[in-house]
Amino acid sequence: ALCDLHPDRVEKSQAILKKAGFPEAATYSGSEDAWKQLCDRADIDLVYIATDWARHAPMMIYAMQKGKHVACEVPAVTTLKEAWDVINTAERTQRHCMMLENCVYDFFELTTLNMAQQGLFGDVLSAKGAYIHNLEPFWKYYEGDWRLKFNQEHRGDVYATHGLGP
């Protein structure tokens, strides 16, 4: 099943599936709560969440309460309370909840891991990494400038797991 606030994005995804020879997927779109209809389906095992960050925790919690496993883009949560709410829901519902972290498998991260495993840094007692990149060309892509606003209102590295994941 496919879900997005914007029907045109669902249509694009549907076209990709069709071109690849997959059957047509059920679609949900056009309202703020369309994703809940997807989660309510009995034939869905896993929900993959790739929305603005403010929606991650509520969507993960709802999906797990509906018996779904969850895979969510980073950051999965933006507050400590959200983290505990997600953890407690996963434990209570016995559903898997995974934060997707594709950047930890990039060349630089795996090279650093390999060097550490070879002992090139000696005994590693502590390490810190960060993931910082210029998002200026993408600001218009993020509806309502949610990503720019988040970065303006919060300090620190919102992708703390990117730099040293493995």
Q: Model-flagged regions — what are they?
A:
Residues 20-27, 92-96:
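A short helix-to-beta-strand connector/capping loop
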Residues 96, 103-166:
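Predominantly a Rossmann-like dinucleotide-binding segment in NAD(P)-dependent oxidoreductases
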Residues 28, 71, 98, 127-128:
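Structural detector of well-ordered beta-strand residues that form the stable sheet scaffold
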Residues 14-18, 87-90, 116:
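Conserved hydrophobic residues forming the short capping helix/wall of the S-adenosyl-L-methionine
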Residues 1, 46, 126:
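Short, Asp-centered acidic motifs that coordinate Mg2+ and/or phosphate
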